[in-house]
Amino acid sequence: MPGKGDAPVLPGARAVARYVRISPMKARRVVNLVRGLPAKEALTVLQFAPQAASEQVYKVLASAIANAENNERLDPDALLVSEAYVDEGPTMKRFQPRAQGRAYRIRKRTCHITVVVEAVAPAAPKKAAAKKAAPAKETTPAATESKTEGAE
């Protein structure tokens, strides 16, 4: 039951990719590009983003759109990326042998990518009821002449 002051719940869908073998910081860079964009525009941005993580985020976003279309019967053109975040997953630890019997630790980081899309009602056309600005006082040559005549 929604509490007092809660925002209205919009229809939408979500998709989660867990244990993705990408560093969470690198995935967050890509997710920040698409948060708040319309879903179709976000797909285009991800398609041409040079980062390696954009491929995984693209798949998650496409899955969220498909979930909204097939499970919730929503129009894919009216979807907006309302939430997109990356959580840290487990880190696999490996050792890299080094000289003199040493070993350096290698951290293979994973992340969980979550994308939520919501249907947005088409925006009502705004009325062009812009108030007319008061006309600026114009100084005409006749007005300036009358002022200067009295000063002589």
From Swiss-Prot:
GO cellular component assignments: cytosolic large ribosomal subunit
Record's keyword terms, sorted: Ribonucleoprotein, Ribosomal protein, RNA-binding, rRNA-binding
Transmembrane segments: none
Keyword Glycosyltransferase included in the entry's annotation: no
Feature: compositional bias, Low complexity: 124-145
Top-rank taxon: Bacteria
UniProt xrefs under PROSITE patterns: RIBOSOMAL_L22 (PS00464)
Gene3D superfamilies: Ribosomal protein L22/L17
Disulfide bonds: none
Protein name: Large ribosomal subunit protein uL22
